């Protein structure tokens, strides 16, 4: 099967923003106007096509990135297509802070992005986070200032905020006509034409007019600024401009495209997706200014097993190159089983092909291959460079793995995922639930690398760990709905850690004799605290066979098991080095198990000799509040052991930044609502681990030990 659409007509992009900026509503309009959806779904009535999980429809937020393939013919008058069809692969991403990992995974495989802003709120905290993520992946973007029909919407304030908050250079290519209830449409500053939506046909048609006299001066001023920015992208254009010759419309579009792809500036558009105004010109903006796979530099990968990760193997958007792709999301489908969303960077892949998972060194075979539309599928037999497809039935491949031609192996990416900061105990109600829960948790963990499942060795409880309360709520809900698990759920707990405060030398002997073969192992270990983030390091400095080589793995295993159960309160001990310096063995009574038990015993002695400390997650909290409540908010944050970092004006409100222990942030949302009469909002992100004050640590240890 030959490629149907040339690569220059592909656009792989995501719609990203802060929660409630209107992402899913905008995507619904896109699907409607591109003909993928026959009616418009609304988030507030639970009918949105992209929000396909039940919890998403109930909560009105998007949790997982749903991928959709659709097509767009660039148009200006609403009836005549000005170009052949463009193929859009769209990822709709969540804006809630607990699901930042989904955004991260999406950005790793996209070529461009549409950033949505709420016309009233402007650049919000999660927008800044996502913007920084997009900067890290060098993703060109355009901005759509949405909700221009809302009370208090201010396009020019949003433009100023983009400059102040993100450091980017905004390049408005539109200017709104009216705002709030008076929003009519916008002026296209490239063509100097008004686009006005008047009819009752769900925004499917609009009227093009010359710019009205009352707005002409402002529009001309803004266009002049746009042209000045654009001509800087080309020496010849700049020279002509200085001689008094402005670029014509196609040349101006080409210059804006060049600047956008080079990340020199960001085109700004405006409208209201909910009121069906401005969505089609935004789609034209995707065509005009966002990259095709051909505009993106070749992806540089490295040879599997190369510890230096020297990136010298190029893979570019070319069907003739060896096949290479990146698995960026796992999803469980009730009919097709496990679906692995994959971005194909080079070459092509056919149904039945065998390929290599270069990350794990395992062979896989393509069973079924589908093109996704939210949670509906179109089965296909072949996929090409630039495609985003879902592969069914892969056994070994998980998020972040590279899949490639076995004859030309390459690793494209090593994704890193954050450590969970909150945990909850979950107990199945019956034996049947136990089995279902085990399967369910395994599948959910495969889908979401920021979710971990562990067993507490002492209590036997299953512990779920995640990025926030909402994150775990959703997963527990999915256990009930998708896997029919009935379980008792504990209270959310903070994921504390422990560390040692000073170096210690420990000499420990394990000896057991009770008839028959005994057990004997003696080890000398030096324990040292390390910098935060170093993890656990084991070093063998044995010389002369004091401990035979075959027993040393037993020492490491014993330490690895013991550190998970802690020294003070049962929390994992991290950031330390254990060096095995000496020991002794018995020809008959020594074994790997004996050395493992000795290592556990030696580790326990750190409680008295290593000055263990309790560590807690510290969250970066931002509260945006009307000034009237600022004193109360700061006082309340201080009472939660918060450290105020600073404050700044945010429109008519004030944004306060603080570092606060996570343990003191449970239930904060209702407290803040009461304190500010519902007018203040907050966001919080994990920042770092810090030592718990001694008095607080003592209380936690007593609670855990029940004394």
From Swiss-Prot:
Single GO cellular component annotation?
cytoplasm
Q: What cystine pairs are annotated?
A: none
* Binding, GTP: 17-24, 92-96, 146-149
Q: List, in alphabetical order, the Gene Ontology terms for molecular function in this entry.
A: GTP binding; GTPase activity; translation elongation factor activity
Using the record, list the residue span of the signal peptide; answer none if the entry has no such feature.
none
- Short name of one Pfam family for this protein? GTP_EFTU
**Which key words are in the record?**
Cytoplasm, Elongation factor, GTP-binding, Nucleotide-binding, Protein biosynthesis
Q: Which GO biological process annotations does it have?
A: ribosome disassembly
NCBIfam families (alphabetical): EF-G, PRK12740.1-5, small_GTP
Biological role stated in the UniProt entry = Catalyzes the GTP-dependent ribosomal translocation step during translation elongation. During this step, the ribosome changes from the pre-translocational (PRE) to the post-translocational (POST) state as the newly formed A-site-bound peptidyl-tRNA and P-site-bound deacylated tRNA move to the P and E sites, respectively. Catalyzes the coordinated movement of the two tRNA molecules, the mRNA and conformational changes in the ribosome.
Q: What is this protein called?
A: Elongation factor G
> Species name for this entry?
Hyphomonas neptunium (strain ATCC 15444)
Q: Which gene specifies this protein's sequence?
A: fusA
């Amino acid at each position: 099967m030959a490629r149907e659409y040339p690569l220059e007509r592909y656009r792989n992009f995501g719609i990203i923003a802060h929660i409630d900026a209107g992402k899913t509503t905008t995507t619904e309009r896109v699907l409607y106007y591109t003909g993928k959806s026959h009616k418009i779904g609304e988030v507030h009535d639970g009918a949105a096509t992209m929000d396909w999980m039940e919890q998403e429809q109930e909560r009105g937020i998007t949790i997982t990135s749903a991928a959709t393939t659709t097509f767009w013919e660039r148009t200006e008058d609403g009836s005549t297509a000005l170009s052949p069809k463009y193929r859009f692969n769209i990822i709709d991403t969540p804006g809630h802070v607990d699901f930042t990992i989904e955004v991260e995974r999406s950005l790793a495989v996209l070529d461009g992005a549409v950033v949505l802003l709420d016309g009233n709120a402007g650049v919000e905290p999660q927008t800044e986070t996502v913007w920084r993520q997009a900067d890290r992946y060098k993703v060109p973007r355009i901005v759509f200032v949405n909700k221009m029909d809302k009370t208090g919407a201010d396009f020019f304030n949003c433009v100023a905020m983009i400059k102040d908050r993100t450091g980017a250079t905004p390049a408005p290519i539109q200017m709104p006509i009216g705002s709030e209830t008076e929003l009519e449409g916008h002026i296209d500053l490239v063509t100097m034409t008004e686009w006005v939506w008047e009819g009752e046909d769900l925004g499917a048609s609009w009227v093009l007019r010359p710019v009205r006299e009352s707005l002409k001066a402002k529009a001309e001023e803004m266009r002049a600024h746009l042209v000045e920015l654009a001509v800087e992208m080309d020496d010849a254009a700049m020279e002509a401009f200085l001689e008094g010759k402005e670029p014509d419309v196609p040349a101006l579009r080409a210059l804006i495209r060049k600047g956008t792809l080079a990340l020199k500036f960001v085109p700004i558009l405006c409208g209201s997706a909910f009121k069906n105004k401005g969505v089609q010109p935004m789609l034209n903006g995707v065509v005009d200014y966002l990259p095709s796979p051909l505009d993106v530099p070749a992806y540089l990968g490295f040879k599997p097993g190369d510890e230096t990760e020297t990136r010298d193997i190029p893979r570019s958007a070319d069907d003739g190159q060896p096949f290479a792709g990146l698995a960026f999301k796992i999803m469980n489908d009730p009919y097709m089983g496990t679906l692995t969303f994959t971005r194909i960077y080079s070459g092509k892949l056919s149904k039945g092909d065998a390929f290599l998972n270069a990350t794990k060194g395992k062979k896989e075979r393509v069973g079924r291959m589908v093109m996704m539309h939210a949670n509906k599928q179109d089965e296909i037999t072949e996929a090409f460079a630039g495609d985003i497809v879902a592969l069914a039935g892969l056994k070994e491949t998980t998020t972040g793995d590279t899949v490639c031609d076995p004859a030309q192996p390459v690793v494209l990416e090593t994704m890193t995922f954050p450590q969970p900061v909150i945990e909850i105990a979950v107990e199945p109600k019956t034996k049947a639930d136990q089995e279902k829960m085990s399967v369910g948790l395994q599948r959910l963990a495969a889908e979401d690398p920021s979710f971990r499942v562990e067993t507490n060795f002492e209590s036997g409880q299953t512990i779920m760990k995640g990025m926030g309360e909402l994150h775990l709520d959703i997963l527990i809900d999915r256990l009930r709905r998708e896997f029919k698990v009935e379980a008792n759920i504990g209270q959310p707990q903070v994921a504390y850690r422990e560390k040692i405060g000073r170096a210690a030398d420990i000499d420990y002997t394990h000896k057991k004799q009770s008839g028959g073969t005994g057990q004997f192992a003696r080890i000398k270990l030096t324990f040292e605290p390390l910098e935060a983030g170093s993890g656990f390091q084991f070093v063998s400095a044995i010389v002369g066979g004091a401990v035979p080589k075959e027993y040393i793995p037993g020492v490491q295993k014993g330490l690895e098991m013991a550190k998970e159960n802690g020294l003070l309160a049962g929390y994992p001990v991290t950031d330390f080095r254990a060096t095995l310096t000496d020991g002794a063995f018995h020809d008959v009574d020594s074994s790997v198990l004996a050395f493992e038990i000795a290592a556990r015993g030696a580790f326990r002695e750190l409680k008295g000799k290593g000055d263990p400390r309790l560590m807690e997650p510290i969250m970066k909290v931002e509260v945006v509040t009307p000034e009237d409540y600022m004193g109360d908010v700061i006082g309340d944050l201080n009472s939660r052991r918060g450290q105020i970092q600073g404050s700044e004006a945010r429109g008519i409100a004030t944004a306060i930044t603080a570092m606060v222990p996570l343990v003191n942030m449970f239930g904060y949302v209702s407290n803040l609502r009461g304190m500010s009469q519902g007018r203040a909002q907050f966001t919080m992100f994990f920042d770092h681990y810090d030592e718990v004050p001694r008095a607080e640590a003592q209380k936690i240890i007593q609670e855990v030990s029940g004394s």
